[in-house]
Amino acid sequence: MSKPNVLDIRLATFEDSIVDLVINGLRKQPKTLPALLFYANEGLKHWNHHSHQPEFYPRHQEVQILKKKAQEMAASIPMNSVVVDLGSASLDKVIHLLEALEVQKKNISYYALDVSASQLESTLAAIPTQNFRHVRFAGLHGTFDDGLHWLKEAPEARDVPHTVLLFGLTIGNFSRPNAAAFLSNIGQHAFQGKSGDQCSILMSLDSCKVPTQVLRAYTCEGVVPFALQSLTYANGLFSEKNKTQASGDVQHKVFNLDEWYYLSEWNFVLGRHEASLIPRSKDIKLLPPLDGILVSKDEKVRFGCSYKYDQEERMELFAAAGVKNEVTWSDEGCDVAFYQLKLS
């Protein structure tokens, strides 16, 4: 099998939009940093290292379930489907599903989507394509929205069954209202056309609300470099946009990494883990083009949340999104489960 192609499906160059998101996020209250800032090449490497630690139960439970249930999941995917993986940073989970599809001799087109072209090429290069005859591989370079637009409009995809993969607790990164809106948006884009009744979402959710277990998972090795790498990436983006900056001189960079800590907290009221960056010891006056912005000593700059869903919250999510759960896959001792969703 030939080397998988990577399709550039970007509707806009999001590197520039990330800079704007950083500026806007730091000018509002409470201050935030955009998730896109954290998943550049080096950031993904740190995240993969972090997620492979023994304490990071979500990944280990996902792999455990997929190893046992992949054949059942694969059986639910129609022949001649397009499978789009929204968040394909690592193959160690989805490979079990792909191998099950191959065993079942299903002719499937698998598309890995990523905002990083180089990460996408690396991911696809790791696929043992020589072991697959029925499953075909390609990459989509773009954002979630780009991927959904492509599913709806691309001639090679729009009229065949679609399965959208949301592994890695991706939907938990959205606020509860935004999670419902995103699932609804998938339905509007991916579940239309001639094969709409055969389309589905396969996604994972975490129900664990034990603070000690959650906090151990999100503070284990690798997470601090992952968090701080975002500031290095931001410095590079600002340097590109403002050519007058001397990128090799720390004093001209927007962010000084030595001034920041990673903060991990469990929010009992909202049922979510919260990840933030916080000044180490003093107020931080940001440098141009963020001059005029002050981050106070005890002020949190939040960059990520991971919402946990009990049964009632799952039902509320599915109802608000206009989808119904067809099948649930989990395993003994697991807080994580996979759900197959279709339009209700």
Curated annotation (Swiss-Prot):
Under which EC number(s) is this enzyme classified? 2.1.1.261
Entry keyword annotation includes Cell cycle: no
Alphabetical list of Gene3D superfamilies matching this protein: Vaccinia Virus protein VP39
List, alphabetically, the InterPro entries matched.
EgtD_Methyltrsf_superfamily, MeTrfase_dom, MeTrfase_EgtD-like, SAM-dependent_MTases_sf, SAM_MeTrfase_EasF-type_put
Q: State whether keyword Electron transport applies.
A: no
Which pathway does the UniProt entry assign to this protein?
Answer: Alkaloid biosynthesis; ergot alkaloid biosynthesis
Give the enzyme class: transferase
Superkingdom is Eukaryota
Q: Name one GO molecular function term.
A: methyltransferase activity
Give the catalytic activity. 4-(3-methylbut-2-enyl)-L-tryptophan + S-adenosyl-L-methionine = 4-(3-methylbut-2-enyl)-L-abrine + S-adenosyl-L-homocysteine + H(+)
Q: Which GO terms describe its biological process?
A: indole alkaloid biosynthetic process; methylation
Report keywords, A-Z: Alkaloid metabolism, Methyltransferase, S-adenosyl-L-methionine, Transferase
Pfam families, per this entry? Methyltransf_33
The UniProt induction remark is: Strongly expressed in planta but not expressed in axenic culture.
The protein's assembly and partners: Homodimer.
Q: Which family does it belong to?
A: Belongs to the methyltransferase superfamily.
Described function: 4-dimethylallyltryptophan N-methyltransferase; part of the gene cluster that mediates the biosynthesis of fungal ergot alkaloid ergovaline, the predominant ergopeptine product in E.festucae var. lolii. DmaW catalyzes the first step of ergot alkaloid biosynthesis by condensing dimethylallyl diphosphate (DMAP) and tryptophan to form 4-dimethylallyl-L-tryptophan. The second step is catalyzed by the methyltransferase easF that methylates 4-dimethylallyl-L-tryptophan in the presence of S-adenosyl-L-methionine, resulting in the formation of 4-dimethylallyl-L-abrine.
Query: Can you say what this protein is called?
Result: 4-dimethylallyltryptophan N-methyltransferase easF
Q: Which organism does this record belong to? A: Epichloe festucae var. lolii
Lineage in the entry? Answer: Eukaryota, Fungi, Dikarya, Ascomycota, Pezizomycotina
